[in-house]
Amino acid sequence: MPKLEQRFDYVKIGLASPDRIRLWGERTLPNGQVVGEVTKPETINYRTLKPEMDGLFCERIFGPAKDWECHCGKYKRVRHRGIVCERCGVEVTESRVRRHRMGYIKLAAPVTHVWYLKGIPSYMATLLDMPLRDVEQIVYFNAYVVLNPGNHESLTYKQLLSEDQWIEIEDQIYSEDSQLVDIEVGIGAEAVQRLLQDLELETEAEALRSEIDVSKGQKRAKLIKRLRVIDNFIATGSRPDWMVLTVIPVIPPDLRPMVQLDGGRFATSDLNDLYRRVINRNNRLARLQEILAPEIIVRNEKRMLQEAVDALIDNGRRGRTVVGANNRPLKSLSDIIEGKQGRFRQNLLGKRVDYSGRSVIVVGPKLKMHQCGLPREMAIELFQPFVIHRLIRQGLVNNIKAAKRLIQRNDPIIWEVLEEVIDGHPVLLNRAPTLHRLGIQAFEPILVDGRAIQLHPLVCPAFNADFDGDQMAVHVPLSIESQAEARLLMLASNNILSPATGKPIVTPSQDMVLGCYYLTAENPKSQQGEGTYFASMNDVVMAYEQGQVELHAFIWVRYDGEVEDDDKGEPEIQTSGDGLVTHLYPSKRLRFDQDGKLISQYIRTTPGRIIYNKTIQESLAI
């Protein structure tokens, strides 16, 4: 099958005419036979397990079920490419054509498109300038509508009539002395189609513009709304009566598959059930029309056909929802398209990409701000091509297959090579929803055990992340350019300020604030090690780690730097035998020699405050 490449700027969705729907599904075979219309509700033959002809999986309409093989088996193999079998009429080609070849169902009676009837706003009701309730009554055979009042004095165009009113008028028309002529009334989608066909869009638009100029308030707003719809129909070249369907497209069979399960049973797409309902009711209606069945029976069948098509297009939009086994609502065409799991958002706007992973995030308090903890299991998958390349380059293996075998065996050498590979190779972390540019940032990966991604707590506000089960995605930039860009522009430590406000977005919160408070808090109660003197801050930390002092105990530590304090009062002065003078303040001790020169300074603090101060000094490299 030749590949067709065509560049386009955008996709536009509009109304399809009946001719265009036929064109999608109709094909002419070399023998002149036109195929494309699905006329039977059958799917596959339960004995041969082959698709039924003219059914929902017909090979003549949609293409062969097996590559290069016709339905009857006369032609097999690729050498018969392009031949159409004289016996079964199936073209010998690839089976993948069943993913794009369409069919169609020719309806025995027109039906309205439920989107245009029941949508908000209802375009059908807006165009006809009628209340939606009235249009619904016509469509679902609850009321007649006057299509042509003729010479009847009390009838008006588009007037609704009940069954009794119409019988009364009918009696008047067919009475012997009747003068009434040209009176036409209709019911169902056919009547709505006729009303839409009678609309002259250009004339209607001109009349509306004139009326808008002299109107005010709510009436003017209503007229503008109607004019906007009419202008859109004119601009797109669509006809209003195309909102009433006479032909329904049947989507390709591989997009609504039927799969055989282990026990011999079949699992099928809900669409097949919905299409089957439409075909059954359509065939029944055609048969009733052929045998000239009573009008009431035909009308009931038309209503049922309308409901079947409604369920196919948008199940549950109007009337009772069609359910399958276990009372589960069947998924209609609309359900497949719309929502988060729909075709657009799931498959077209968002796709799965290579070199990416996803896992739950947990806090990594020992990480630096530009680092993230990447699980080994995930890292070896993401960086596998790089690891294989390095293994071959270092001569540890000879080929890719041997390298993969080494990785599968979890050989210890793999982790050493992986450490070398990820060193200096940033990864991108993204948390959905990405509402601003800081929703995706670069980090240097650090290999960790477990299966959770570790994240520095300071970058949480930028991602709007917390650790109650949030998940994040990891992406690996492959090219040198993308790695450089990630390092220079996207590294977390380079994104301190919010792009929206210019204020710092990296601010400590919750656990960090509580931790800082706990470290620096004072406890007036007596604690272990209280009043002890230490020669340096390192001695204090060592004593705390050995359990000799508690975190909040008041201790004295020698400190030679400047100290800001509130000791304004006069100190208590002590003099030792060797002539040294000590000034005693509430929060510090100053010792001077005989010449008044400061020898040492001890300050009153807690191990917690020393640890806090020491950590900040080390991180700032003071």
UniProtKB/Swiss-Prot annotation:
**Keyword tags:** DNA-directed RNA polymerase, Magnesium, Metal-binding, Nucleotidyltransferase, Transcription, Transferase, Zinc
- Care to name a GO molecular-function term for this sequence? DNA-directed RNA polymerase activity
InterPro entries attached to this UniProt entry:
DNA-dir_RpoC1_gamma, DNA-dir_RpoC_beta_prime, RNA_pol_asu, RNA_pol_N, RNA_pol_Rpb1_1, RNA_pol_Rpb1_3, RNA_pol_Rpb1_3_sf, RNA_pol_Rpb1_clamp_domain
- Cross-referenced CDD domains, in alphabetical order? RNAP_beta'_N
* Tagged with keyword Aminoacyl-tRNA synthetase: no
Q: Name one Pfam family in it.
A: RNA_pol_Rpb1_1
Coiled-coil region list: none
Q: Which GO terms describe its cellular component?
A: DNA-directed RNA polymerase complex
Kindly state the subunit structure of this protein: In cyanobacteria the RNAP catalytic core is composed of 2 alpha, 1 beta, 1 beta', 1 gamma and 1 omega subunit. When a sigma factor is associated with the core the holoenzyme is formed, which can initiate transcription.
- Quote the function comment for this protein: DNA-dependent RNA polymerase catalyzes the transcription of DNA into RNA using the four ribonucleoside triphosphates as substrates.
The molecule here is called DNA-directed RNA polymerase subunit gamma
Q: Which gene encodes it?
A: rpoC1
